[in-house]
């Protein structure tokens, strides 16, 4: 006898006729007049539960098996047999059922209903992993995460753990969560009445990071190829389906790399990750295609087989102005492209993933390399059909005098970035990188449109439960 996951049984990793023990939770119980019960037991290792055929000859059949309801936890031992019914290749002829946990009141068990709205499930974030949709999201999220780590490992990158607490604003937007141990009801003040952060834990103002990029650059300028993969925070008061206050970012940084180099890196990473999901999580993708978005499988297959188009921002604006489409937000040179513009380019004009590059400097961050025209920077966005922007990146400004000029233009104190400026003073090199919002990637792959449903415990304005 061996402990087996449901997935390993369905994959044929255990011989027909062998005895295995499966541990999980009851999804359903059906009883037949012939004195047999059918238990659907789910352990989360794959989308489908396994069927256990339980005879009434078991010692605890009447007093326990017939009382099992959805959500009860069980340890089931039985012989693997080929299933005569459609839908699964194998089932268990059960010889032993151990009940490890009962549902206190089946009538009030929140997950007992056949179907809940996705909005209602957000109020039950501690129980929603038990549902088909959130379980499938979790497995796909894990698959994508593992694939991304694997991709960078196989390509010689070093994973760097960048700090979550920082004194630097990477984006220069100021939308940061402050970290403080000061007594909010008795704040120390300076002589001019301002909060005296010298008395705070770090002796200065500190914040939750909006990006690991600046710290990542320091390691790229020593180890050549690095990436970060961790949580980031934005105090942006946007209560939309596309925004979270806490989300995960993948941020590679490569020394001696140009904008073209990281555009190729982004394409390789996305295709690698999507191929992994297509190969490893087809059961979950089939669920999403049936119940969430019928195009998900076809969209991923099309993505991995397409060459990325490339277009300059200036040319993209020209395409949008001449396309004859009336957009909600009018198009002119100098604007940041909105989602409707991005999706038109990817879905209707190029009909493929597209890299838009060389954006106006005034709508991009201080660290992006100024182009020779003095008006644009070496920035790029990767636009995907079906969602729009999925990656943003740039060649970094490696010239100290130009970096200082950009900091001044954006009214940022260069003394706050002294260590970042040091990279340009001691052996500076051209280098480039990008950021991938991981939840947006999971949303794209699953078709689950609200980003709050693709992270286990969403953090958003007025939402910090659990």
UniProtKB/Swiss-Prot annotation:
Pfam families, per database record:
tRNA-synt_2, tRNA_anti-codon
What cellular-component terms does GO give this entry? cytoplasm
Task: Answer whether the UniProt record assigns the keyword Thylakoid to this protein.
Answer: no
| E.C. code | 6.1.1.22
Q: Where in the cell is it found?
A: Cytoplasm
Q: Which InterPro entries match?
A: Aa-tRNA-synt_II, aa-tRNA-synth_II, aa-tRNA-synth_II/BPL/LPL, Asn-tRNA-ligase, Asp/Asn-tRNA-synth_IIb, NA-bd_OB-fold, NA-bd_OB_tRNA
A GO biological-process term: asparaginyl-tRNA aminoacylation
Q: Superkingdom, according to UniProt?
A: Bacteria
Give GO terms: molecular function aspect only. Answer: asparagine-tRNA ligase activity; ATP binding; nucleic acid binding
Q: Has UniProt tagged this entry with the keyword Signal?
A: no
Q: Which family does it belong to?
A: Belongs to the class-II aminoacyl-tRNA synthetase family.
Q: How does it assemble?
A: Homodimer.
Instruction: Give the protein name, as stated in the record.
Output: Asparagine--tRNA ligase
Q: Which organism is it from?
A: Shewanella sp. (strain ANA-3)
**Underlying gene:** asnS
